[in-house]
């Protein structure tokens, strides 16, 4: 919902660019993409990603973020078994996660890789679940997984429901600026 294919127009002519609209929870779609394109790296950006939406429709987040990620992991793990040893050694699966899996940041301190997960919404719980699945594929199948925990990202083309665009649009429109909880949350921005 938040993506806009027009944002990719500057790379559409690249030989290694392919746009495929599909559902990562669909085994056949994933199998066909892997066979047709034989990627060296898979970066899993596919996610339902807005906390407020996860309150209204948590099952959609579980479907995409948990079931979809598990299907992508499973099908990719099956697929790489057909690759040469050299290709397997070079292959990477990058799971894009979120800092939300750690819960709320206190006014002092920061998160690290050893901070325990403490998700507080269906969104963060679904992303924590997908991270645990990715780790389990790494440990069980020696599957080459890297997990990143991005903080709040901001930049051109960001969907207007995200915090910075929402605050700017509301301020320019003389609308109320939403305050979450007691307004004491601390967030990192990239």
Language-model features, listed with the residues they occupy:
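N-terminal Rossmann-like NAD(P)+-binding domain of SDR-like oxidoreductases, especially those catalyzing
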Residues: 1-153, 173
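Donor nucleotide-sugar recognition loop
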Residues: 66, 185-186
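Glycine/proline-rich active-site loop of Rossmann-fold NAD(P)-dependent oxidoreductases
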Residues: 128, 153-166, 173-175, 179-184
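A conserved structural motif in NAD(P)-dependent oxidoreductases
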Residues: 188-190
């Amino acid at each position: 919902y938040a993506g806009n294919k027009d944002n990719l127009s500057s790379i559409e002519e690249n030989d290694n660019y392919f746009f495929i609209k599909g559902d990562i929870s669909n085994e056949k779609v994933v199998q066909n993409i892997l066979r047709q394109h034989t990627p060296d790296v898979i970066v899993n950006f596919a996610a339902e990603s807005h906390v407020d939406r996860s309150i209204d429709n948590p099952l959609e987040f579980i479907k995409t973020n948990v079931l979809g990620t598990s299907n992508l992991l499973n099908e990719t793990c099956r697929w790489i078994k057909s690759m040469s040893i050299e290709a397997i050694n070079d292959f990477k699966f990058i799971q894009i996660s979120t800092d939300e899996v750690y819960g709320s940041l206190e006014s002092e301190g920061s998160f690290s890789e050893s901070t325990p997960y403490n998700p507080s919404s269906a969104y963060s719980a679904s992303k924590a679940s997908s991270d645990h699945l990715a780790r389990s594929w790494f440990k069980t199948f020696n599957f080459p997984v890297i997990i990143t925990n991005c903080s709040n990202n901001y930049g051109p083309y960001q969907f207007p429901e995200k915090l910075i665009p929402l605050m700017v649009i509301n301020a320019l429109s003389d609308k109320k600026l939403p305050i979450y909880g007691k307004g004491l949350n601390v967030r990192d921005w990239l």
